[in-house]
Amino acid sequence: PTTRGFARYYGLADGCCNFFNPGVEARDGEGLPGRKGQNRLRRWAIEDKVIMGYTNPDKDFYTTDAFTDYAMERLVEYKDEDKPFLLYLPYTAPHYPLHAWPEDIAKYRGKYKIGWDEIRKQRFARMNKMGIIGPNHKLSERASKAWEDLSEKQKDEEDLKMAVYAAMIDRVDQNLGRLFAKVKELKKWENTLILFLTDNGACPEQPNTTPNIPPGPVESYRTVSVGWANASNTPYRRFKSTDYEGGTRTPFIAHWPGVIKPGMTDQVGHIIDI
C-alpha cells in the first residue's frame, strides 16, 4: 500500500486471515491457528515491510481491535495537518473465518434458533416498514434447504455459526464507536466525512478446514452456511461472486454533520465514484 499512495499502513495485505493469529505459529498455551489451507500464508504489512505469516505475541490480539488501535494512533498523529487526509479502515469482519471473543458470542447465542426462513421474513417486513425497499419488492426464493428440515443438533450448530457472525459485526460496531469518540475528542467531528460500506453481499463459500472444531476460537476455521448467507442478503437473490443483487448490491452510509442531510436514496453508485 505504501507504494500505491498511502503514507502509512498496518494490517492484512491479503483477502482474509485468522482474526486472532494471522500467522502459522502457535502461541504458548494455544493450538495452531486455523488456516484456509496448510500452504496458504497470509501477507501482513507494517508500513513498508511485508511479513509472511505474522503472529502477534499478544494473546489479546484480534484484528478488528488492532486495526482500530492503529487508526486511532494515526488520527492523533495527523490531527494538526493543514490539508484534509484520508483514513481508510478496511475491517475484514465479518468475512470468514468465524472468529469472535466469547463475551461477544454470548450476546447472540440462541437468538438464531428461529432459523433462516423466519429471519428472512422478519427482515423483509422490517425493511418494508423502514422504507428501505418499496411495496413492489418481493422476497427472493430460499437458496438452501428449509430450516425445519434440519435436526435439532444441526439447528444448534447453525445457531452458533450465526452467533459468532453477529459477534464479529458487534465488535466492528464497538470499534467504530471508539474511533468516532476519538474524532470527537480531537474536535474534528464536524469537519469529518465518514463513508461506510461493504464490498459485496454475504458469502456462501465453505472452506471449513476444521470441521471438528466449533466456530469461534483461534484454532478453528469455519464459515456460515448458505442459508445464513441467503438470509444476510434479504431480500435479494444469491450471494457474493454472482451478478445477482445479493452479490453486488450493498448498503452505503455517508455522514457529515451540517453538510449531508439525513435521508435515503436509491441512486446507483459504485466504489469508483468515491
Model-assigned labels for residue ranges:
Residues 1, 8-11, 85-90, 193-197, ...:
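Structural recognition of the beta-strand scaffold that forms the well-ordered cores
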Residues 62-79, 110-134, 154-192, 202-204, ...:
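A long, amphipathic alpha-helix that forms part
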Residues 7, 173, 191, 199, ...:
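Acidic active-site catalytic centers that drive phospho-/nucleotidyl reactions
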Residues 137-142:
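Short coil/turn segments at secondary-structure boundaries
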Residues 1-5, 79-83, 187-190, 228, ...:
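Extracellular/periplasmic catalytic domains that process cell-envelope and extracellular macromolecules
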Residues 1-105, 109, 114, 143-166:
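Formylglycine-dependent
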